[in-house]
UniProtKB/Swiss-Prot annotation:
Principal cellular location given in the protein's record: nucleus
Subunit architecture: Forms homomers and heteromers with SUN4. Interacts with SUN1, SUN2, SUN5, TIK and WIP1.
GO biological process, one term: response to salt stress
Protein name: SUN domain-containing protein 3
Bilayer topology term: Multi-pass membrane protein
Effect of loss of the gene: No visible phenotype. Embryo lethal when associated with disruption mutants SUN4 and SUN5.
């Protein structure tokens, strides 16, 4: 019995010691686990807890760009607080997760650009307002324009209010974008409305200009045929005369000798002579006669070789002829021709530079512009070959006689026929003035007054026709002596009686033309008097139109002042809106910072919960193992097994709660 009791006591003591050792080991393990949990919590709390991606991944939050969030944006006029901002924390977190430094910098740059755009739009809008007001249609009463500009600020305020209401229900990033779009849109709307208004005003101006042109055409409707001025008439006659003279010059008919040869004005037999030459020249007078054995001789090395020839008469020089027949000499190459009407003189008229060929026969040179001269000067510039002497055998000059040319200038049948040729459609008008002129020469004063009344009724073109007809008539009267002159001997002078007869007839024609010009001036005076009366009447009408335009401009100026004041009010309103926008952006930045702190706190709590869950899971596993071992050995007591069961239940409950 004693042995069994001792055995039992020993067994119980061993069990108690084993139980104590087990509890000690268990307590040491629990203490070690709690120490490990504490250090792991500290390490996790000081780790990479500021990242946003783990929070999104762990909490299963959606990307703010994918869906349409339901959070609300507090209006500018309403107070902003953390309580109102934390109504929906999940949406706020999802809204701020994608905000980073690069996006903030981009937003600031965009805001700066938009602010500059808005300021530029303000200036443009102000300038366009002034343009608009200055280009308002003058036909409008001004009421529509005033109501339009009065409604413009109201419409802008309504649009801006609608913009703020529409932006409620968007996230902060969308809010920024929408505000930027609103700013840009406001400027674009202003510019588009201004452009439309300018286009409309330009169309109105075009219509107004067309109307003004129509009115002017209506005012100018009574057509008035302005007659040609006297200067224009004289210039027309002189131009036709000059044209005929130029035609004659281009086709100059040289004066002919009785034998049919051309008249040489540089012939010694006609009275021409050599006046001077360079001192080295020998035989200068030989060039005025046709003797092949005589010539003008100059050493080729001499500088400034020249010869001055006096023509037999003053003439219109058109052609000169030179020749060198000496074989053993150098031919003339380049020479200059000068002329004058008086000698001696210091100023010679340049008539042309010519280049001769290296030949031993006569060469003709025609002047581009024939000149009236009496004295010719030939300057020898260069020569051909390398002979010692440069020779010239012959020089001849051809042209028109001065007296004959003067008579042709005074009275030319061809010129009169060409200058006063009737125009198409005016033959009927010109026949009547010719008859009137003939009747004026033979009728008395009463007939003259009757004809003058008829002439006043006729248009001024008839007066021009009368003048032309009278001059044509006078030219017909003067044609007979000219024909006599033309049929006279070709090389002889006309008698003095013929010249006097021609001059007297010319004076008669001038007297007749003077009377016609006097009547022409009377007609011009009458016509221009009527024109001035019409111009005075038109000036009165235009003065009334100018007064009306001045009144319109005064009304436009008043409307412009009103529009400028409205533009200033709009500018102030924009400044207030910009200030509110800046305030809202600052409050948004504060909310974003607070939400970042909340997100960090939540992430830290999440990691703590994860740690606690891990520890509880470990304790639960240990408790399960202990219970299984106790049940397997059958040595566990109820108190010990109950403690492990309690630990298992508590760990399971904590894990269940954390998993929810």
């Amino acid at each position: 019995m004693q042995r069994s009791c001792r055995t039992r006591r020993r067994v119980s003591v061993n069990k108690f010691n084993g139980r104590n050792s087990f509890y000690k080991v268990s307590l040491s393990l629990v203490f070690l686990l709690w120490v490990l949990l504490f250090f792991s919590t500290l390490l996790i709390s000081h780790g990479d807890g500021a990242k946003d991606e783990p929070l999104n991944d762990s909490m299963g939050m959606a990307d703010p760009d994918d869906g349409q969030s339901d959070e609300k944006v507090v209006p500018f006029d309403g107070p902003l607080s953390l309580a109102s901002a934390s109504v929906d924390v999940t949406s706020d977190l999802s809204r701020n997760d994608d905000v980073n430094l690069s996006e903030e910098s981009e937003d600031k740059e965009q805001e700066a650009e938009i602010s500059s755009t808005v300021s530029g739009n303000d200036i443009e809008s102000k300038d366009t307002y002034l343009l608009k007001q200055s280009e308002i249609n003058k036909k409008d009463t001004g009421i529509d324009a005033g109501s339009k500009y009065d409604d413009f600020p109201k419409k802008s305020e309504i649009n801006n209010t609608g913009t703020w209401n529409d932006t409620e229900g968007k996230d902060d990033n969308n809010f920024l974008k929408q505000s930027q779009l609103n700013k840009t849109g406001t400027g674009n709307d202003t510019e588009s409305s201004d452009n439309e208004f300018l286009e409309q005003n330009q169309m109105n101006k075009t219509v107004l200009g067309n109307g003004t042109e129509i009115n002017v055409s209506k005012v100018d409707q009574p057509s008035r045929a302005v007659p040609l001025g006297l200067d224009e008439f004289k210039s027309r006659a002189s131009n036709s005369r000059n044209k005929s003279l130029s035609d004659q010059v281009s086709g100059v008919i040289h004066r002919m000798e009785p034998g049919g040869k051309e008249y040489n004005y540089a012939s010694a037999s006609k009275g021409a002579k050599v006046l001077s030459s360079n001192k080295e020249a020998k035989g200068a007078a030989s060039i005025l006669s046709r003797d092949n054995d005589k010539y003008l001789r100059n050493p080729c090395s001499t500088e400034g070789k020249f010869v001055v020839v006096e023509l037999s008469e003053e003439t219109l020089v058109n052609t000169i002829k030179i020749a060198n027949f000496e074989h053993y000499s150098s031919n003339l190459k380049e020479f200059e021709l000068q002329g004058t009407l008086v000698y001696p003189t210091d100023t010679w008229v340049h008539m042309g530079n010519f280049t001769a060929s290296n030949v031993k026969h006569e060469q003709n040179f025609t002047l581009l512009e024939p000149k009236w001269v009496r004295y010719l000067k030939l300057n020898f510039i260069s020569h051909y070959g390398s002979e010692f002497y440069c020779t010239l055998s012959l020089i001849e000059v051809y042209g028109v006689d001065a007296v004959e040319r003067m008579l042709e200038d005074l009275i030319s049948v061809q010129d009169n026929k060409n200058a006063y040729k009737p125009r198409e459609g005016d033959s009927e008008h010109k026949e009547k003035p010719m008859q009137q002129i003939e009747s004026l020469e033979g009728d008395d004063g009463a007939d003259k007054s009757t004809h003058r009344e008829k002439e006043k009724e006729a248009p001024p073109e008839n007066m021009l026709a009368k003048t032309e007809a009278s001059m044509a008539k006078s030219s017909n009267k003067l044609s007979e002596p000219v024909e006599e002159m033309r049929h006279h001997q070709p090389g002889s002078r006309m008698p003095g009686d013929t010249v006097l007869k021609i001059l007297m007839q010319k004076l008669r024609s001038l007297d007749l033309n003077l009377s016609i010009l006097e009547r022409y001036l009377e007609e011009l005076n009458l016509r221009y008097g009527n024109i001035f009366k019409e111009m005075d009447r038109e000036a009165g009408v235009r003065e009334k139109a100018i007064v009306a335009l001045r009144l319109d401009l005064e009304g436009m100026k008043e409307r412009q002042e009103g529009m400028v004041s409205e533009a200033e009010e709009m500018k102030e309103w924009r400044k207030r809106v910009e200030a509110e926008m800046e305030k809202a952006e600052k409050e948004k930045e504060n909310i974003r910072q607070s939400l970042e702190q909340v997100s960090k706190r939540l992430e830290w709590m999440e990691k703590k919960c994860l740690t606690v869950f891990t520890v509880c899971l470990g304790f639960g596993i240990i408790a399960v193992i202990a219970v299984v071992i106790g049940m397997g050995t059958g040595l566990a007591e109820k108190t010990g097994s109950g403690a492990w069961l309690l630990l298992l239940i508590s760990s399971t409950f904590i894990m269940f709660v954390l998993s929810l």
